[in-house]
Amino acid sequence: MQPAKRRASRFDPNILLVILFSLFAIGPLLQPGYQWDAHDARHSVYFLFEFDRGIQDGIPYPRWQPDFAFGYGYPFFNIYGPLATYVAEAFYLLGAGYTGAVKIVLALSVVASGLAMYGFVKRVLGRRPALVAAVAYMVIPYRLVDIYVRAALAESVAYVFVPLVLWGVWAALHRLRLINIVGLAFAYAALMFTSPLVTLLLTLILVFFIAALALARANDEQPFRQLTRESLLPFLGHLGHLLFPVALGLILGVCLSAVFALPAMTESRFVRVDQWYGGRYAWGSDFVEFFQLFSPRWGFGVSVPGPEDDVSFQLGVVPVVLSLFALLPLFRKKPRAGLDRPA
């Protein structure tokens, strides 16, 4: 009985709270029907239908969709991350139907992303900040826009792996262990296999995230103000030692996702993609005005040139306030001990 009691005592009740709070975000998905009017709602069903045709034909990775492009076919999953569709296909084969499978994956993406964020922040800062971060991550306005306005299946699933990649980077930088490097590699590969766009955006942020963590860790062991000409070279060597496992994990992640990433990068010139970047999709016409980040306006339309978009770009009052509070430790003389917890 003692081992069972110890296992029960180790269970974190906040996990249940994260799942319960996720119901506020996924409640509409639990109701009958399907949001056909959302931006990519039809596309998600079409993609799954074509993907299933390939699976039923015995093709484990169906890159070619024969019914697209007016029946001429199109290598859609050669350039579009297939992981979210693989998960939807599993639920379809279990009998959920096309629309049911898409709704299940959208709902699970919210729950899983909250649990992933909770695990990451708990490791760094503890349970209470982790619970706040997880709930905020699940219900920030953009996540709700992604689900109920854009119906962006792949992007919604990608946000499961964002905190896992951050967790992997933090763990690999704080302790040189094989499991940390492998975990980072699989998280980064899964993100690439889900959404190359989110991967690109996160990678740009990772540059600053990794630099800040590495410099902070190096400063703890060798304060910058004590650097001399003689100690500079050993300091740089130590900095490289800290960065090596992170770089190795990210490189291995790219290698693991090469089955998708390599054809996507080398063969995209053979596929017409200009219609994705021109006309109404031209990104140069969709820069957001500063006030739109704080505007409470909510719409179900699309982004148009100028500030009169019929879709929300708000950051959300609560996330902004929490972000400002998160900056307070920077003004303390002594950093929080939680940031140096072993990985």
Sequence positions of predicted segments:
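Start-transfer (signal-anchor) and selected internal transmembrane alpha helices
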Residues: 1-29, 235-245, 340-342
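Membrane-helix interfacial "entry" motifs
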Residues: 6-7, 66-69, 94-103, 126, ...
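Membrane-entry segments of alpha-helical transmembrane domains in multi-pass membrane proteins
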Residues: 11-15, 72-80, 97-107, 153-154, ...
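Membrane-embedded helix bundles of polyisoprenyl
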Residues: 17-25, 77, 104-124, 128-215, ...
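Membrane-interface coil-to-helix junctions
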Residues: 23-113, 135, 140-158, 269, ...
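Carboxylate/His-rich catalytic cores and anion/metal-binding grooves
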Residues: 40-55, 115-141, 327-331, 338-343
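Perimembrane helix-loop-helix junctions
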Residues: 201-253, 330-338
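Periplasmic/ER-lumenal interhelical loops and adjacent helix-loop junctions
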Residues: 249-331
